[in-house]
Structure formats: structure tokens, C-alpha cells
Amino acid sequence: MKKHLFLLLFLPSVLFGQNNLKYAETIKVEDLEKHLIILASDSMEGRETGKKGQKMAADYIMNHFKNIGIPPYKKKSYYQKFKVKNGRHMCKCDDCDTDFLKKMLGKNKYIKGENVLGFIEGTDLKEELIIITAHYDHLGKHEDKIFNGADDDGSGTVATLEIAEAFMLAKKEGNGPRRSVLIMPVSGEEKGLLGSKYYTDHPIYPLENTVANLNIDMIGRVDDWHENGDYVYLIGADMLSQELHDISEQINNQHIGLELDYTFNAEDDPNRYYYRSDHYNFAKNNIPVIFYFNGVHEDYHKVTDTVEKIDFNKIQTITRLVFLTAWELANRDERIQLNKTD
């Protein structure tokens, strides 16, 4: 009898653990491609923060959240609107045409943008929060040139849309996350990480309740250092929580099998990627982060960063890795621990 009772108690956790793969497999190439064809189209005018195209992209993301059943946060709005002083342009490589970027991005003293909130309330641990981010803004247009930003960061944005849909399907089927999950495409990244900075200054949950941030920025191309797309650069996972790094490794080894490349995973990396995307605003608030990144390529910050060059199988694989990692963080009994400091 005791043995049978143990098995009955153990069975729900086993089934809950098996569900992660079921929902991960709903993240598919055709859906990622469908979203990116729209978000990286000329009609979005390059999605520059504060401009018409960015507002159109925000509406597209909001409508996706609405259509899959995510309600407005606190029944009020899907948007966290901000008006902040223009920052400095962000560039993930050292050979960008900075004079050109300043002309494009430095015209307005104040910037109005929106972060889009896809909030999925948890169950017994709902007061703790996992945040998944990607920036949906890009460089906009200049004269007759449109910077579509298919990889930067259309690729990460469509990943968040599919992660949101997978979590919502789980919730509808009675397998929703124990911790709350916030899928938050942000704007203002190209102008100085403005949207994520605004969020960490005005969080919807206390920052001390935020367990981790998983940030996705450029996952749709292959850089010059790799022969194929079976890799992803991970940055930051062990800097604040070795436990987060270990979980990430375990999930990948068990379910995905990518090469996890830590080439740029150092605070003193000369490329300074740790400081160049939205995860940094969480990390500097002592929130563990992972930054998922494919590296820069010849079309980075150019009008040639277009949809037809995207490797959607690569996006699918990395998106499933992010989802499975978030699933584990949201459903484990104990929240991950910060590294001990002397």
C-alpha cells in the first residue's frame, strides 16, 4: 500500500516533467517564419522606437498575445509605455558605422516606446517571476533604405511569441507554470537598452521576486566561426548563479544537443557582449540572466539583414531550448540560488 501511495504521489511530477517536451514541440519553423515575414517586412519600416513601424510591431505582438488567450496585465493593458531621454546607440560589434547610426538614431531628445507584456500567472509559486525578453525594435529607415532587422532582433522576437503560445497552451490544458512567467518583447534597445531599463526601474513585480531573465537577441544566422547552425553563444549564465548555468547545461544535454559556446562569456571579454543587450539591466540588479546569441555577421545593422537569409531551423532549436529552460525554472520546487560572495 505504501509503495502504491508513493507511486501515486510521484506520478503527477513525472507527467508534469514529460509535458515540457510536448509543449516545446509546438514551437515550429512554419509559425516562426510566418511571424518574421510580417515583422521584418518593409511595411514595418524598420521598427525604429518611437516611429510608426515600431507601433505597428507592438500592435502585432499585442494581438498575438490576445489571440492565444493572454489577458491584458491586471485587465488594463498589454503595454508598458515609456517616455525617456534618448540614450546612446547600441552596437554589438566594434566596426559599425557609428557616424551613420548617430544620424539615424540621435535626432530626438526624448523617446516614446512600449514594452509589450505577455503575463502568464503562476499557481502555487505565482509571486515569483521568470522574465523572457527580446527587443522588437530596430534601426528604422533612412531616406529610401529600410533596415528590416530580420535577425536583429526579429529572430528573438518571434521566439518570444512562440514561447508565449507554448506556455499558454500548457495553462489551458491544466499544466500552467507554478511561477509566473512574463514574456516581454521590449523596444528602445537600439537607442541604449531603454525599454528594459524602464522596466527594471518600474517592474510589475518587485525585482527581488524575479528569479531569472532569459534574453534572446539574434539567433537566426551563423557567424564566421561556425560551419553550421548547431550552436548558440551563451553569455552570463554562471556570473550570478552557477545553478542557472548547471540547469541550462542539463536541459540542453537531455533534450536539445546544441553546442553551447562560451567564447564571449566573460565580463572582461573585449567585445563586451555582456553589457550590450537587454539582459544587462536585469544582471546589474542582481538577477541571474542568460543571453542567447548567434554572433554578428556581414549583414549586421545593414539593409541586407532580411528574412530570406534566416535559418529557421536554428531559431526553432534555440527557442525550444529557451522554453525548456524557462519551464524548469518556473516549475522546480526551489528557486535558483545566487552565487555566494565573500
Feature-to-residue mapping (PLM):
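Bacterial Sec-dependent N-terminal signal peptides
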Residues: 1-20
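Second-shell loop/turn segments in exported
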Residues: 19-26, 42-52, 102-107, 143-153, ...
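N-terminal capping segment at the start of a domain
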Residues: 21, 26-52, 56, 68-76, ...
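Acidic/His- and Gly-rich active-site-bordering loop/insert found
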Residues: 39, 65, 108-139
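A non-catalytic alpha/beta surface segment that caps or lines the substrate-entry region
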Residues: 47-119
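Alpha-helical metal-binding/catalytic segments enriched in His/Glu/Asp
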Residues: 116, 132-191, 322
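His/Asp/Glu-rich mid-to-C-terminal helical/loop segments that flank catalytic regions of hydrolases
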Residues: 165, 296-342
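Metal-dependent peptidase/peptidase-like ectodomains
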Residues: 186-291, 337
